[in-house]
A protein has these predicted regions:
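N-terminal Rossmann NAD(P)H-binding glycine-rich loop of SDR-like oxidoreductase domains
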Residues: 1-17
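Flexible, glycine-rich beta-alpha linker
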Residues: 27, 97-99, 122, 146-170, ...
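NAD(P)H-binding glycine-rich loop region in Rossmannoid oxidoreductase-like domains
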Residues: 28-70, 80-83
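Conserved catalytic-site region of short-chain dehydrogenase/reductase
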Residues: 56, 91-107, 122-128, 140, ...
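Short alpha-helix in the Rossmann-fold core of NAD(P)-dependent oxidoreductases
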Residues: 66-74, 90, 126-127
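Conserved Rossmann-fold NAD(P)-dependent oxidoreductase catalytic core, especially the SDR/UDP-sugar
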Residues: 75-120, 146
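Active-site Tyr-X1-5-Lys
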Residues: 76, 118-151, 167-181
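Glycine/proline-rich active-site loop of Rossmann-fold NAD(P)-dependent oxidoreductases
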Residues: 102, 141, 153-170, 180-184, ...
């Protein structure tokens, strides 16, 4: 029986599973609510995608919230998986866990070689700590828990907010409004950075494979 957290999010909606929960079903920052979820469903497998997320604007404006929410959500879910004897956990991290000044190409071994970018460091450190917790639990308890690091994801059910959304949906929304209102199409930044994206339904296919086959201690980049 597979439980997906963040079931109404970008990745969660693309995944197929027995049970999907969202923030409407439980506040995963609250340990008692997390216990209730695991008591009710008693999952054997968990795909953990839940978190407080957003684009550049949200990361800059809600640093404290992003850190607290994600630290609590990740810590509670991973600990509940241990207590309730979950056989396999796939925990989603983020490419922002990588250092800002790091030599390319990125590999899984480079996560802790420097500080993350200052635009979203609270979120990035919270995600890094989820990976550390997974590794610590593997080493102490011998659990088959793994971390995955997807590149920038896009697809149905994304956040199309211009101020707080991700790059592709925000640009789509901006372009739509510019066309509707016959105004200029404004794009933030210099246009020089290279960005990599992956479709949410491709993430779902890879995640299903990882759930069944991947057991290595190192996080795996999905790109």
């Amino acid at each position: 029986k597979t439980l997906v957290t963040g079931g109404t999010g970008l990745v969660g909606t693309a995944l197929s599973s027995d049970i999907k929960i969202s923030s409407k079903d439980a506040d995963l920052r609250d340990w008692l609510e997390v216990e209730n979820v695991f008591d009710q469903y008693n999952p054997t497998h968990v795909i953990h995608t839940a978190g407080t997320v957003g684009g550049l604007g949200a990361n800059m404006n809600y640093k404290g919230k992003f850190f607290f929410d994600n630290i609590m959500i990740n810590t509670n879910v991973i600990e509940a998986c241990r207590i309730y004897n979950v056989e396999k956990l796939v925990c989603f991290l983020s490419t922002c866990v990588f250092p800002d000044n790091v030599e390319y190409p990125l590999t899984e071994k480079k996560i802790h070689l420097g500080e993350p970018h200052n635009s979203n460091y609270p979120y990035a450190y919270a995600k890094r700590m989820a990976g550390v917790q997974i590794q610590a639990y593997r080493e102490q308890y011998g659990l088959n828990y793994v971390s995955v690091i997807p590149t920038n994801i896009y697809g149905p059910n994304d956040n199309f907010s211009i101020d707080n959304g991700h790059v592709i949906p925000s640009l789509i929304h901006k372009c739509y409004l510019a066309k509707q209102n016959n105004t200029e199409f404004e794009v933030w930044g210099s246009g020089k950075p290279l960005r990599e994206f992956i479709y949410s339904k491709d993430i779902a296919k890879i995640t299903n494979w990882i759930l069944k086959n991947y057991t290595d201690p190192e996080p795996i980049i999905l790109s």
